[in-house]
Curated annotation (Swiss-Prot):
Residue(s) carrying N6-(2-hydroxyisobutyryl)lysine: 6, 10, 37, 75-76, 96, 119
Function: Core component of nucleosome. Nucleosomes wrap and compact DNA into chromatin, limiting DNA accessibility to the cellular machineries which require DNA as a template. Histones thereby play a central role in transcription regulation, DNA repair, DNA replication and chromosomal stability. DNA accessibility is regulated via a complex set of post-translational modifications of histones, also called histone code, and nucleosome remodeling.
Residues recorded with modification N-acetylserine: 2
InterPro entries in the cross-refs: Histone-fold (IPR009072), Histone_H2A (IPR002119), Histone_H2A/H2B/H3 (IPR007125), Histone_H2A_C (IPR032454), Histone_H2A_CS (IPR032458)
Record's protein name: Histone H2A type 1-E
Molecular function via GO: DNA binding; enzyme binding; protein heterodimerization activity; structural constituent of chromatin
Region Disordered: start-end pairs: 1-22
Bias (Basic residues) ranges: 7-19
Main location: nucleus
Length: 130
């Protein structure tokens, strides 16, 4: 018999993605490909796409968590752009990070200037004192 075929030798191990090795949901392989194709640097290290995918996954999870809370507060089960806007603008750090970002169909935060609110009159308090 020739040395070809699958009879002898070791069976090849099942392929394991770099995302699963890193314990991530975001695709490490795709991030690596995009880093190489994007002309950001001549060479890309093996750890760079793992780190970047982890950062992107963390930020996404953080925003979705807050947006889910905003949706629940509005008695909705589906996250819409308005919920994303409320989540980002009410969080100090995310608002700083995404300060120059416009979210389509996001609306604005409800805000009434203090000077526009009706003034409390003193006559109402004096009537109670007598």
């Amino acid at each position: 018999m020739s040395g070809r075929g699958k009879q002898g030798g070791k069976a090849r191990a099942k392929a394991k993605t770099r995302s699963s090795r890193a314990g991530l949901q975001f695709p490490v392989g795709r991030v690596h490909r995009l880093l190489r194709k994007g002309n950001y640097a001549e060479r890309v290290g093996a750890g760079a796409p793992v780190y970047l995918a982890a950062v992107l996954e963390y930020l996404t999870a953080e925003i979705l968590e807050l947006a889910g809370n905003a949706a629940r507060d509005n008695k909705k089960t589906r996250i819409i752009p308005r919920h994303l806007q409320l989540a980002i603008r009410n969080d100090e750090e995310l608002n700083k990070l995404l300060g120059r970002v416009t979210i389509a169909q996001g609306g604005v935060l409800p805000n009434i200037q203090a000077v526009l609110l009706p003034k409390k009159t003193e006559s109402h308090h004096k009537a109670k004192g007598k």
